[in-house]
């Protein structure tokens, strides 16, 4: 017989119920609702960095210690996405991983087959051991672990939802399998020295998703029984300690509930298996689970605390070697009570029989050790936060300075660098780099230091541009009323940006903004409304339609085939209406006896093909969805047809090159129909309706902005569009020799950039939230990729998220043409605005508290950070979409009273040819 209890660990990715007389029903808070971080916390006792979820699954071993690595040998069965991580990260030959093929992870079918595979192969191992002496001897050693990764319920929950009959049937399969494996091990060993732990790496929401940090996704079961595990604590006739509203309907009020953290499970497993605690474990051994006496518990608690203190000691020594003036953690410094003294005191308590006091002292020492680890982790945070904040502020200032230099002054003022400025910036950067070199800081620190110095040095070099730009932009503000109006507008702009920050948490904020924005045309007076009544009504209705989506739950809950078909039908209807009313649309939505241009039959035929592809996408999607709902899997023909429709539809714009129709409204329709089939295939609910409403808002916005730009009697527009103050002689000369084909930006254009920014946020938050990025439904991608493939499926989901942004980039590109501004001008303004949000979210990031708070704040910051890069990328997308597009002649020539440089360009060309001047104003 072995002298140590054997350990069997069952991991399952859903909340599970299992109550027996010898089982202690407990619940555990998970650190993460994602697979990899959850398994690392469970098996290694370490809370891996959140970014680890992006490191992949199959070929990224866990590069730190684990319970498996500390065991004499571990046998594991289950998913090819999880087991290889721990097999490759352990001592060679210590972990055996038996995995099924990835083709079994089919989300279009019931997932219980995955669990049956695991149970069957465990039975085969023990059956072989009865005839294989070598294997039999290996199985009877001490400190061995059996790890059964049961993925079936997770797969079934994703595909059919946790309250489906398929899910309940899968629970029965797991119930029976657990019973059979338990009896199998009891019969094989016949010594009652096996411990069992049943738990999960994450929970699951009612709609079959996880990953967003919601309590439903981070609360998981922890059920332990067998050798070394304490019996349940019963409280007959009363509510036992530990219960709350969450467990009120379990009908287990008489049994005490014990809550632990996810990393604590690794410590529990190590103790039950008789192994050392993993070297990186930060878990606290849950003593309430153990049958051991007080002396054994006291000794185990001390060993647990010493492991944490050893981690602190090693990390502190490393920090001392790289810091010029190291500031020690006060509770563990020499000035305080020395660690050695506290450990010796605890040992003395154990030797004198004061076990309970020793346990309390060990727990307190462990908390101090965790505090020390936290202190070292955040040692440089204040300095880094200050440095990064200066960098973000420098970027905002640099972006705005560049906008003024290129798109207000058209580059007529050159940067002015001084020796003092160069010396100051160089000295600052040298001092920072020297400090980093001495401290052996990561390479990222050098980037943190470089960008603030670079940005602010560039801003200083362009100080004359800022001075001249202020005159150009604010020169018309001379009266107190104009100044008050400016301050009011600035306050409104700041308020809208702050409301967008709240919109990351409360999507309903966008509803309020759209309702307010629906009345925007009224601000230009009744004369404007009379001239553009139809356009104003269209804008109003589309804004009201958009306001409804953020009142609905994120479109990741349940699949609604009828809603999908309605969205697809309306997309088809939009295309048909265009073909019928093409002359009306291309005549700027006005009737004329003679069409503005002859009909392009090739182009109309291609539009018809795109309409057909959208209809086909809807029909194939309906067939696939119904087949999978009936548990019949994804028909191969449907999968092939879905891919054909998706690829062909995205390539359709290339066909228009044969005989293009370059009218801007036709181009918008082509882009709309290009993305429509993809959106239909990848939608599960009301996203198709959003796609139509969002497109209507964008088209209305482009036309409305142009109408306001041309409207002569709008006081706001008149102030913004009035000609700039007379240029200085040298500036005029520069402008004439280096003319720009675009007009300079004015204060009015800040509103256009703000509208773009609001619509940019709505493109994402109207159908989802930050949580929906990681907590997504697989219903849509399973119509194309039914087999689990995180990278391919993730790419499909990202494609779906990007489609609305492609629409808005194309529409902004067209609006730039209609307003006569440079293509990059408004994009650069938005890039500056976006980092105001980034800086806000940077300072509210949390790494303590609930996983919901931690995950949400980090996600907010990451998304806001990527906005800047994303906006820059959209400029290139916009240029591609609107290449060769034509707007009406009156728009291209709408320079009116403004000093648009296109007139100067014509004048320069005329003078070059020796002709008369063009007479530009």
From Swiss-Prot:
It is an enzyme of class 2 (transferase). GO terms for biological process: cell wall organization; GPI anchor biosynthetic process. GO terms for cellular component: endoplasmic reticulum membrane. GO terms for molecular function: mannose-ethanolamine phosphotransferase activity. Glycans are attached at residues 69, 132. It is a multi-pass membrane protein. SUPFAM superfamilies: Alkaline phosphatase-like. Pathway: Glycolipid biosynthesis; glycosylphosphatidylinositol-anchor biosynthesis. Its EC number is 2.-.-.-. CDD domains: GPI_EPT_1 (cd16020). Signal peptide: none annotated. It is found in: Endoplasmic reticulum membrane. Keywords: Cell wall biogenesis/degradation, Endoplasmic reticulum, Glycoprotein, GPI-anchor biosynthesis, Membrane, Transferase, Transmembrane, Transmembrane helix. Residues 715-737 are annotated as: Disordered. InterPro entries: Alkaline_phosphatase_core_sf, GPI_EtnP_transferase_1, GPI_EtnP_transferase_1_C, Phosphodiest/P_Trfase, PIGN_N. The chain crosses the membrane at residues 37-57, 386-406, 418-438, 441-461, 483-503, 509-529, 533-553, 561-581, 606-626, 640-660, 679-699, 752-772, 795-815, 825-845, 862-882. Ethanolamine phosphate transferase involved in glycosylphosphatidylinositol-anchor biosynthesis. Transfers ethanolamine phosphate to the first alpha-1,4-linked mannose of the glycosylphosphatidylinositol precursor of GPI-anchor. Belongs to the PIGG/PIGN/PIGO family. PIGN subfamily. This is GPI ethanolamine phosphate transferase 1. The gene is MCD4.
